[in-house]
Amino acid sequence: MSGKRDKLAQTRLYGIADLGYLEEAALEDSVAALLEGGVDLIQLRAKNVAEGRILAFAQRIAPLCKAAGVPLIINDLVSVARQSEAAGVHLGQADGPLSSAWSALGHGAIVGRSTHSVLQARTALRQGADYIGFGPLFPTPTKEG
């Protein structure tokens, strides 16, 4: 089993630092609280935010994650994951093929996929997704149910 697969197999708590819910000024403190709380992986999610700003946010929290030995995953943006030296990327259904993410980030990168049906989950697994996310099951302020 590869290092990333070992890490994912041991992952029990996947934290999401979502700027749709967090104040930008609270990002580092929120990530620090997630790390102190024992998360095994953190995803930075910032829908409807300019790519340059997301990169700046990623660069602010990457050192915290690295110091804690917790992989940082960037939502949707392979380019930000690459530039911020994140551990990987989480892709939605419309965010391109998984193979393109590995081409850009290397095969050691963690690449996950959002799924909303059994068919999408099976497709993601066939394409080699390192993990799949399910949902949303219920509507939220940033996602329909």
Annotate the PLM regions.
Residues 98, 120, 140-141:
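Short glycine-rich, flexible loops that bind phosphorylated cofactors or substrates
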Residues 44, 81, 138-144:
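A short acidic, helix-capping loop that chelates divalent metal ions and anchors anionic groups
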Residues 1-95, 103-130:
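Conserved N-terminal beta1-alpha1 strand-loop-helix module at the mouth
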